[in-house]
Structures are given as structure tokens and as C-alpha cells.
Regions:
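Glycine-rich phosphate-binding loop of ATP-dependent small-molecule kinases
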Residues: 1-198
Length: 198
């Protein structure tokens, strides 16, 4: 699961990780605003439907964290409701872990100054201009509130069965290598624990 501010490089990180992994064992899902069908169902339905089968890897870009974080940053969600949603998230991740899933959560972080610089660089390049939208700038204006909401979410949902790893995104190469290294270490650790004793 990758999360972080819009424009911090989550999509690029996913792209790099996909280059390093065997695509035959991957299920990659990007979540935007809920569709009409998803709005007619319980909140968790859209995520349950996309969980990978046992033995496969699911990559979630935009996830169950996105909606509560954005809603809280824009002041459309009370602190009490936000805390209830975070409790639901922690319960969901605990349930996945107890069922044998390896939950890896990466928070891609970029400072406000670094994010502004990155967004301007992307916007100034005709080849990447399309990647920065009015919505990205709208979200950027709420950066401080988004970070405040994010820090609270990370504290509330950082658990032994689903810990967060903060990935500094100032250096794009470091960001990608850190994400890949974390996945490799977590996969190796899980496989070693599952290996039969000799």
C-alpha cells in the first residue's frame, strides 16, 4: 500500500516497483473517487473486491486511507468521525494480517517546499505537464492540514502487524530504492518464517 500527498511520487514509485517484480504475480489497483456502483455499497466493498488471492501480491495505489485523509484535510470530516474511520482501518488491516496477509504500508513523504518544486518542474515540462492538475494544486494548498491529518493517521494505524515505513521522496532514486528494499526485506522475512524447519 502506498500513500502520501498528491504529487509526492507515489505513482512513480509504483511504476518502479512494477519493473522489479514479476507482473504475473501482481494485482495492481489505483483508487480514485468511488464509482456510482461503489457508492451504492458498503465503504469497504471496493477494497474487499480487489484483495489478491493467496500467493499473489496486491499493490494499492490510493487506498482506504485516501478518502478519510482528504476529507479531514478539507474540513469535511469531524475529528470523532475521522478517528472512527481510522479504527475501522486498523481493524481491517488486523483482520488481513490474522488471515495470513503481509501488509506493507509505505508513506511517501515530501516537504511542502519539495512538493511545490516537484510540481512546478513537472508542470513546466511539456512531456509531464499532464500529470499536474488543478486538483493537485487544490490539494497542495491544504498541505499543512493534510500532513496534520496524516501524522494522526500514521500514529493511530502503525501496528506490529501493519507498520508504516516513511519513505523520504526528496531524492527520487532513494525513494524508489527504499521502497524496493523494504518490500524485498519484508518478503524475505515472511518466506523465512514460513519455511519448514530443517
Amino acid at each position: 500500500l502506498l500513500a502520501g500527498a498528491d504529487g509526492a511520487g507515489k505513482g512513480e514509485t509504483v511504476k518502479r516497483v512494477l519493473e522489479w517484480l514479476d507482473a504475473r504475480g501482481l494485482d495492481t489497483h489505483a483508487f480514485g473517487a468511488p464509482t456510482d456502483e461503489e457508492r451504492e455499497r458498503p465503504r469497504w466493498w471496493r477494497y474487499w473486491m480487489r484483495l489478491p488471492r493467496r500467493g499473489r501480491i496486491g499493490i494499492f495505489f490510493g487506498s482506504w486511507y485516501s478518502e478519510p485523509l482528504v476529507e479531514r484535510a478539507f474540513g469535511r470530516l469531524s475529528r470523532a468521525r475521522y478517528d472512527r474511520m481510522l479504527s475501522e482501518i486498523a481493524f481491517f488491516e488486523q483482520m488481513l494480517a490474522e488471515d495470513g496477509a503481509l501488509v506493507v504500508k509505505l508513506w511517501v513523504h515530501l516537504s511542502k517546499k519539495g512538493l511545490r518544486k516537484r510540481m512546478r518542474r513537472l508542470e513546466d515540462d511539456p512531456a509531464t505537464r499532464w500529470r499536474i492538475t488543478k486538483a493537485d494544486w487544490k490539494h497542495f494548498r491544504k498541505y499543512d492540514r493534510y500532513i496534520e491529518a496524516s501524522e494522526h493517521a500514521i500514529r493511530r494505524t502503525d501496528t506490529s502487524h501493519a507498520p508504516w515505513l516513511l519513505v523520504e521522496a526528496t531524492d527520487e532514486r532513494y525513494r524508489d530504492l527504499m521502497a524496493g528494499r523494504t518490500l524485498l526485506e519484508r518478503f524475505r522475512s515472511r518466506l523465512a518464517a514460513a519455511a519448514p524447519a530443517r
